[in-house]
Amino acid sequence: MNAPRYAEIGVTTNFSFLEGGSHPQDYVHQASRLGLDAIGIADRNTLAGVVRAYSELDNEELAYKPKLLIGARLCFVDGTPDVLAYPTDRAAYGRLCRLLSAGKLRAGKGECHLTFADLEAFVSSNAARPFPSSWPGLTRPSTSLQPRVLQDVDARDKPGHDGGKREIGRSQILFVLMPPYRFQAKAITAALERLTALNSGNVWLALAPYYRGDDKRRLARLRRIAAAADVPGIATNDVLYHHPSRRALQDVLTCVRDKTTIDKAGRRLEGNAERHLKPAAEMARLFRADLDAVAETLRFADRISFTLDELKYHYPDEPVPPGKTAQQHLEDLTREGIATYFPNGISDRLRATIAKELTLIAKRDYAHYFLTVHDIVRYARSQNILCQGRGSAANSAVCYVLGITCVDPTEIDLLFERFVSEERDEPPDIDVDFEHSRREEVMQYIYRRYGRHRAAIVSTVIHYRPRSAIRDVGKALGLSEDVTAALADTVWGSWGKGLSEMQVRQAGLDPTNPMIGRAVELATELIGFPRHLSQHVGGYVLTQDRLDSYVPIGNAAMADRTFIEWDKDDIDAVKMMKVDVLALGMLTCIRKGFDLIAQHKGVRFQLSDIKSEDDNNVYQMLQRGESIGVFQVESRAQMNMLPRLKPRCFYDLVIEVAIVRPGPIQGDMVHPYLRRRNGQEPVVYPSPSGEAGDKNELQQILGKTLGVPLFQEQAMRIAIEAAHFTPDEANQLRRAMATFRNVGTIGKFESKMIGNLMARGYDATFAKNCFEQIKGFGSYGFPESHAASFAKLVYVSAWMKCEHPDAFCCALLNSQPMGFYAPAQIVGDARANKVEVRPVDVSFSDGQCTLEERCGAYHAVRLGFRQIDGFRWADPDEERVRLEAGLPPSDDWAARIVAARARGPFGSLEQFARITALPKRALILLADADAFRSLGLDRRAALWAVRRLPDDVPLPLFEAASAREQQDEQAAPLPQMPMAEHVVADYQTVRLSLKGHPLEFLRAVFATERVVTCREVSETRRNGRRVRCAGVVLVRQRPGSASGVIFMTIEDETGIANIVVWPSVMEKFRKEVMGARLILVEGKIQASPEGVVHLVAERLVDRSSEMGRLSEGLARPPLPTGADLYEPLTYEPLNGDRRDNPDAPAQRLRHPRDVRILPPSRDFH
């Protein structure tokens, strides 16, 4: 007897969000292990997970590759039962994509509203008709593009692939009707009749057991219905997870989806763990009374020939003028660019490089891609939007002369093969950064230029991470909010593998408690599951054909944004082009700084005007580590590296950007490079044995980095030149280095590379360190070209900070949020550099921060209304986009004040309120921010005066009488507001204070505990000195290359101090490290010869509760006696100390309002 065979057609993956209990890859492997003929991925109204299953079929670990059926489970809003839809070929697949797009584009983000009428429209012969010109919005009209523009663009019918518009013929979508567990025979019969009338010969009725004790009777009813309708029945297990062990997790997902708990979910949960992939023998046993239903699965699978290999991508042709080919136009633009960038001519070497690149571009047929990116950059520059390309594209001389990148090929050793390679059959990838405040203009240009049916943003899969997994599992299991919050608060950053027993104990919980243990176990299992789709940060897919015939398109949450269901890895797998239109805050800052310099100093600068070798003052500033606000070098690690590296030229900045990265650090390349740079170690170049090759083969590769590999390009060249990798092996190595997801695959190259290097006589330590560096690049490393692109912005931002600190401070504040530091630190740094900063004031401030008349060497910075938390103001760039789109202006309170002030100065608060007509909430916010000083009112007096005003919208007849009554009322004398309360109020309203720092009012408190200032810590040179220091936590950083070490920056009234927290200390004081706003640190001083000082923490105490003293009136501490001044510092218990009982809960704040006194730290990982 032949062994039974079976194809499972009803697989639900975890891309049916909060329903499926397994990844698509899990199903592929399980189907391979079970020997199934085929598996059909059919997620709920989506194709989001199919590429992952498709890509997994290439996994070498698969002993057997089942056939993959690409489909979707269509769920309707009009009561039609669910239908599995499987296209038989490329044309049918295109119609399915467009059907799903239609449902998604009429619904909100993450939803799909389908009706049976939609099914009729896309299965019948009318499916050949394109969408009408109103397609981009359907029932959700665009809010930023004029309708006439949309119609003109979107009505075009581009030539190319049929995109699913071919006449039906044998191109079919196969339908399987899926009856629910409880069904009415009439409803199923009616649905079958409608489906067969629509798609005769291509309809099945699913026969799925649910293992609830009535399967025999229920399946018999369904067979009778199928026979009466003359459609075949087909077996399926209606699979929810690949293995029974995932049943509990699937129950949790059900509870999360339905917002209930395990105890209350009842029949919404499966009563068993049977809905998993089953082997053919088991399905044959279950359907022994109807084996033909099992055999039907094979006939069904045989009907389907479509695979994702059939998706053939075509570049858009808009950038190509009539009468030219794309390659001809690219070469013409290249010649024009050479004349622009090199007016005195180019060297023979550069000419040969450009010719080589153009030849390879022609061979790979990539000219359209380069022209498309050039077109987008050209538009941005025509609108005075700063932009520059980066990444591997900066290896291209053609990109430079086209104006896409800024890396001069005469300054940097380019490796074009890292960008485009003859051996590599994959599209190039050019990342272009635009001003973050004006990027939307560029994005809407792309929609107008290519049409919304041919352009959309790539998706990003939002995965469960430790915090979200713990919170959702805790809710599903019925844990109280305080328990789940306590567990979640022990997690650092976004990613992680779960919770340790120590973390559970530090949350004040018992890890041996069965419920807590189960919650931790399920949360760990849930980490990495997709939660929902979101739009990518800026990756666009552009096509010559209809994009909605490749992949479904849906609405983003943001108006006028649409995105596809596939992420960047998916489109790489199917070889579709992506253009990255990214946002970079520093470009906004630089442009706004240039505008301020032009407005107030009469000099107009462009990026190209700032020459990186012109100003030695800039390099001297960086050598001192004064880089707050400077692009890429403002982290504590970079600020500590600057005095050690002592950059003196542009290429030093390239190295500075790249050296504080996992690659060089893990490869132990940093210290050898610094020793050689500082003359403490001779510069030597690794070499092979004499008989194995040229002893100087690495000198050309490593010459600029003193014999130490620091960049990805160098690692690749070492693999090729020294380890003798073939071009294909080198390409595989490049791919393994390229992204986070491939960190686990890079190890397979280890033995080959190290073995080849040692076999050729290279030192074993060098060989191992080289590969450790490559593994570091797999986490996060910079290629030389990318570092060079960023180094240009490092220099420009450092130049502005050095030469125009007033404009730099103002531009930084107007570009928030961005960077490492909050406005308080930006303002503090500017004031330390002799820039006067003036408070928000109704008589002088605008919506944005502005520059006022000179005060000494620099202009004064006036804080704008944007600094007031909750105050309405409109960004000028965003407002311009709104007005150009024909939308009404924003409700801009700041603009009202500026307009009223233009008619004359304000004489009183009452007059101000009357002529600005601001709502009372706006007046209260201004008074809270102490913005009425120019009217003779401090914060308390202004708040009192505002509260005396009538409520909003007074009746005209009584307005004058009300005004007279206010004039007659005598002002009550108010006690003076203590300065400490003013500082607290400043931080609560404008997030900074020009009046003082909170710590100066607590200095007497800390002095009794022998706490030194941050300045004393930073200026000490005594290694090993034990000190206590307290400060506001500004930044917490846990770099991936630091092996779990956390770097904290704290601030008091004297400056900042750098704190190092080792992993063992972090585990002991996790709550304090992660949660404290005001922290006391005890430890030892660690001072380097270059003057970099750290306080290495041994104990930490959360002293955030002390902030309550500022708002409640300062409690006077006992006066010190002076008897302990010469005693050795010992570790007596401090307020809130948990040294002897680390599992005890940390001290809590006295009142919830105290949490809001200080802004939260900016945390990075």
From Swiss-Prot:
Comp. bias regions, Basic and acidic residues: 1152-1165
Catalytic activity, as annotated: DNA(n) + a 2'-deoxyribonucleoside 5'-triphosphate = DNA(n+1) + diphosphate
Keyword Cytoplasm: yes
The keyword Cytoplasm belongs to this UniProt entry's keyword annotation: yes
Class of the enzyme per the UniProt entry, highest EC level: transferase
One matching Pfam family: HHH_6
Gene Ontology MF term list: 3'-5' exonuclease activity; DNA-directed DNA polymerase activity; nucleic acid binding
Region (Disordered): 1111-1165
GO terms classed as biological process: DNA repair; DNA replication
Localization in the cell: Cytoplasm
Any single Gene Ontology cellular-component annotation: cytoplasm
Assigned keywords, A-Z: Cytoplasm, DNA damage, DNA repair, DNA replication, DNA-directed DNA polymerase, Nucleotidyltransferase, Transferase
Enzyme Commission code(s) on record: 2.7.7.7
NCBIfam families according to UniProt: polc, PRK05672.1
Function: DNA polymerase involved in damage-induced mutagenesis and translesion synthesis (TLS). It is not the major replicative DNA polymerase.
Family, per entry: Belongs to the DNA polymerase type-C family. DnaE2 subfamily.
Protein name: Error-prone DNA polymerase
Organism ancestry: Bacteria, Pseudomonadati, Pseudomonadota, Alphaproteobacteria, Hyphomicrobiales
